[in-house]
UniProtKB/Swiss-Prot annotation:
Catalyzes the NADPH-dependent rearrangement and reduction of 1-deoxy-D-xylulose-5-phosphate (DXP) to 2-C-methyl-D-erythritol 4-phosphate (MEP). Mn(2+) binds at residues 146, 148, 217. The keyword Transmembrane does not apply. This is 1-deoxy-D-xylulose 5-phosphate reductoisomerase. The lineage of its organism: Bacteria, Bacillati, Bacillota, Bacilli, Bacillales. Its EC number is 1.1.1.267. It comes from Listeria monocytogenes serotype 4b (strain CLIP80459). 1-deoxy-D-xylulose 5-phosphate binds at residues 121, 147-148, 172, 195, 208, 213-214, 217. Pfam families: DXP_redisom_C, DXP_reductoisom, DXPR_C. InterPro entries: DXP_reductoisomerase (IPR003821), DXP_reductoisomerase_C (IPR013644), DXP_reductoisomerase_N (IPR013512), DXPR_C (IPR026877), DXPR_C_sf (IPR036169), NAD(P)-bd_dom_sf (IPR036291). Belongs to the DXR family. Keywords: Isoprene biosynthesis, Manganese, Metal-binding, NADP, Oxidoreductase. NADPH binds at residues 10-13, 36-38, 120, 122, 201.
Length: 380
């Protein structure tokens, strides 16, 4: 039985992870977890899964829960996340928190010898060189939870990675894929949160609409698979049936197909290289799709993706700036402070004023992250 530490238990990935564990109690046990502010959902999870250790964000929530669950050890804040991530009894850390707050817990878990299932792409975006170096030194497996990277991992199974011609990441195009740049000036938060194919959290859904999410995934793929940015291509695949592909030097492609359901890559990360049965409401049949559609990305329509490629190629602290600026800009949009079409402009502004620092250490990354957030907040 694998003992799981789950960071971000009440979020979209966390909820679907718990569904898998609920279906397979003989294979998995939740021994520690974290959640943010959703106390009602968090209480229910603690009651059902009976973790031994829990981290919440606020001190007041920790105090309340300590009184309700005297047999559980509680922590709070970033230090709480770090405590939970290194819980001695855990085998696998599944990091499903949103944002760069996931970086330090991941590094701590690697140092503690945990296997890592990574859904927190910001960890690799901001500090991929540090994370991959630490994982290599500790001989730790780093398995992707994102559907695109899981698809690539499956396509590469047994293949010689030196024979890769390029990686092809697929994208749905998000909520506004059929709108022009001019039409984006009037879109609302409610409209932006209606993703055509996937059920995701708010921040991730907005990132999908701007294509910043795909940009972060390009950087994640660069680190996970050691492929140059010029050899990573993004294409629009409207149906979200082909989750990603690998092209090899002989011109052949290997793709992974399936229903757009995050339980598939989650279970693969937890069971790799094995697989589990997943009960779907509707069986996936390839014959239900008379055609699959592919489109080139229009970088004028989706400037966020171009910014992400530029940040990745510049390297150093520039990806940290892009990520931090985007997190603040998206929060501003969700709170009604920023128009949707201004999200990219805020990120570009932050990148233009920053001189990248090459091969940054952890302290430098954290400092640049905080400085960028503070700067972008002044622009809201």
């Amino acid at each position: 039985m694998k003992k799981i530490i789950l960071l971000g238990a009440t979020g979209s990935i966390g909820t679907q992870t718990l569904a898998i564990i609920r279906e397979n109690p003989e294979k998995f046990q939740i021994v520690a977890l974290s959640f943010g502010r959703n106390m009602e959902r968090g209480r229910a999870i603690i009651k059902e899964f009976k973790p031994k250790m829990v981290a919440v964000w606020h001190t007041r929530d920790r105090v309340i829960l300590e009184a309700e669950f005297p047999n559980v050890k509680f922590f709070n804040g970033l230090e709480g996340l770090r405590e939970v991530a290194t819980y001695l009894d855990g085998d696998v850390l599944l990091n499903a928190v949103m944002g760069s707050v996931g970086l330090l817990p991941t590094l701590d878990a690697i140092e503690a010898g945990k296997a890592i299932a990574i859904a927190n792409k910001e960890t690799l975006v901001t500090a991929g060189h540090l994370v991959m170096r630490a994982a290599k030194e500790k001989n730790i497996s780093l398995l992707p939870v994102d559907s695109e990277h899981s698809a690539i991992l499956q396509a590469l199974n047994g293949e010689n990675t030196e024979r890769i011609e390029k990686l092809v990441l697929t994208a749905s195009g998000g909520s506004f894929r059929d709108k022009t740049r001019e039409q984006l000036s009037e879109v609302t938060v409610k409209e932006a949160l209606k993703h055509p194919n996937w059920n995701m959290g708010n921040k991730l859904t907005i990132d999908s609409a701007t294509m910043f999410n795909k940009g972060l995934e390009v950087m994640e793929a660069h680190w996970l698979f050691g492929v140059d940015y010029d050899d990573i291509e993004v294409v629009i695949q409207r149906e979200s049936i082909i989750h990603s592909m690998v092209q090899f030097v002989d011109g052949s492609f290997i793709a992974q197909l399936g229903t757009p359901d995050m339980r598939m890559p989650i279970q693969y990360a937890l069971t790799y290289p094995d697989r589990l049965y997943i009960p779907y409401e509707k069986e996936f049949r390839i014959t239900d799709f008379s055609a699959l559609h592919f489109e080139k990305v229009d970088y004028e329509r989706f400037p966020a993706l171009k910014l992400a490629y530029n940040a990745g190629k510049i390297g150093g602290t520039m990806p940290t700036v892009l990520n931090a600026a985007n997190e603040i800009a998206v929060a501003g949009f969700l709170n009604g402070q920023v128009a949707f079409y201004n999200i990219e402009a805020l990120v570009e502004n932050a990148m233009n004023r920053h001189t990248s620092i090459s091969d940054p250490d952890l302290d430098t990354i954290l400092q640049v992250d905080q400085e960028t957030r503070a700067y972008v907040k002044t622009l809201l």
